[in-house]
Amino acid sequence: MDNVVDVDEEGNQQKLSANSTPYQTQECVLYGSIFVKNVPDLERRLAGLWIRAAKNSMSTKCRSALEPPVHQILRRRFRTEHQIQNYWQLKYIGVPEPDQKCPTIVRKEISSLVHSQDMMTYAKSLGLRMDYEYITQGKLWTKGNIKILHSTLTRTLRAGTYDSSSLKSMSDSALVEISISLPESAEYMPAAKSLRDFADQLMPLVNMEKIDYWKKMFSTPAAPARR
């Protein structure tokens, strides 16, 4: 019997068949943005529905030299109580499913927790190189298996330097991400439709969209024109 995910309208909880794996390697996701000045309005909208938790992290985007490239995100809590933590989230992001009928992005996603005092050396040993890094500060809201994360993005003017004089805000808007994680062989369409329904409740404050970001990320550079 195939693994099946049933997402109910009330609690949005997964009901998995007996032989399903608890390890979640699929992700349905939507993206949006909201002006920072309007974030309190979004939080008030979410307050009656969601349980919140603080999130403040530094993220590094890496890729391999393989074709197609392997994309990894390294994330850790940043300067918690004046200490930099050595626990990292290592997140692999695959190429999204080419399903035009699905109302959300569906992609392979594998997350692991790693403890390392020199994570970048480990990443380099995997054949990864850093594309860019940024610092996020925001809140994570959850209800059942739905997660909403809103965060502001900050970059450092000098790599490896994170004092206040070296940090610069990237935008006057906050990034909003809403997602559901699923087992690998689960049918994703019911969860995707449920996620779309919840996302519509956030309008008109924020319009959550199925962004075709991968068309740029995974595109092959065009060969230079001959003269």
Curated annotation (Swiss-Prot):
One of its GO terms (molecular function) is transcription coregulator activity. InterPro entries: Mediator_Med18. Belongs to the Mediator complex subunit 18 family. It is found in: Nucleus. One of its GO terms (biological process) is positive regulation of transcription initiation by RNA polymerase II. Keywords: Activator, Nucleus, Transcription, Transcription regulation. The keyword Metal-binding does not apply. Component of the Mediator complex, a coactivator involved in the regulated transcription of nearly all RNA polymerase II-dependent genes. Mediator functions as a bridge to convey information from gene-specific regulatory proteins to the basal RNA polymerase II transcription machinery. Mediator is recruited to promoters by direct interactions with regulatory proteins and serves as a scaffold for the assembly of a functional preinitiation complex with RNA polymerase II and the general transcription factors. The keyword Transcription regulation applies. Its main location: nucleus. This is Mediator of RNA polymerase II transcription subunit 18. GO terms for cellular component: core mediator complex; mediator complex. The lineage of its organism: Eukaryota, Metazoa, Ecdysozoa, Nematoda, Chromadorea.
